[in-house]
Amino acid sequence: MRSAQVYRWQIPMDAGVVLRDRRLKTRDGLYVCLREGEREGWGEISPLPGFSQENWEEAQSVLLAWVNNWLAGDCELPQMPSVAFGVSCALAELTDTLPQAANYRAAPLCNGDPDDLILKLADMPGEKVAKVKVGLYEAVRDGMVVNLLLEAIPDLHLRLDANRAWTPLKGQQFAKYVNPDYRHRIAFLEEPCKTRDDSRAFARETGIAIAWDESLREPDFAFVAEEGVRAVVIKPTLTGSLEKVREQVQAAHALGLTAVISSSIESSLGLTQLARIAAWLTPDTIPGLDTLDLMQAQQVRRWPGSPLPLVDADVQEQLL
């Protein structure tokens, strides 16, 4: 006997969360809970404004239609990426095919005063890997901050993300202020320039390795080994089903590329599932999941060690 619930939710964000020049005041999304006999599976559907093709209203319509079909015995996954991901997670939990083991290590997202960051990062236990957003301020300032962090902490490796913010000139301005002796400790820089060709040229000219992120979701993208390309950053909410995520990870690994499972600012429920996916598909790589502190609450499942209050599903708006 099958049954299902769908919930709509909204979480207030901390002030100052900006995505592509848009302030994100709340994170909006949906949960689906599927039950079959004694088994249960949860999934999160939370399109990311400015990044997802769909908004949450469109996702809601597709999700409700899919759930009704599933209740009638049809299991074909929807095509919409955020819905396909959430539904496939719920089905994987239902069938016990998503392993419970999780990688809760996260590359901390660094912002704020560089002196404070140095103290925080110096005290990090184990492998020191952190993420810095660049491209929000002047490229010269970004270069100086990155250089300062690498100089102050000799065993630090940085993942940088420019979100295609730079022209070739801006990229060169950034690199000019990063000591060539430190550049090998930039694990990768995600999508530095507005075009892939400019990003490839940036890698060749600076010796700073790059990673593809947005490119993975473009129709002409193909997995190929290229000089200067070290990694791919996979955001499952923007990608689609678990099977598609797995295919992309396998394609990257086959070329010797690092694959990083990364957050699209999911709630704690989605983040804990991403931590499980990372442990399953990319066990040797620290995932990019340090986004929970951007929110003011956790929902349904706790992220270990988070002090944020937990909100249960039964206080959310139930749609089904």
Swiss-Prot record:
Gene Ontology biological-process entries: menaquinone biosynthetic process
Protein name per its UniProtKB record: o-succinylbenzoate synthase
Gene3D superfamilies, per database record: Enolase-like C-terminal domain, Enolase-like, N-terminal domain
Reactions catalysed: (1R,6R)-6-hydroxy-2-succinyl-cyclohexa-2,4-diene-1-carboxylate = 2-succinylbenzoate + H2O
Pathway note: Quinol/quinone metabolism; 1,4-dihydroxy-2-naphthoate biosynthesis; 1,4-dihydroxy-2-naphthoate from chorismate: step 4/7; Quinol/quinone metabolism; menaquinone biosynthesis
EC number: 4.2.1.113
Catalytic residues of the enzyme: 133, 235
CDD domains given in the database record: OSBS
Pfam families (UniProt xref): MenC_N, MR_MLE_C
Native species: Shigella flexneri
Superkingdom of the source species: Bacteria
Binding site for Mg(2+): 161, 190, 213
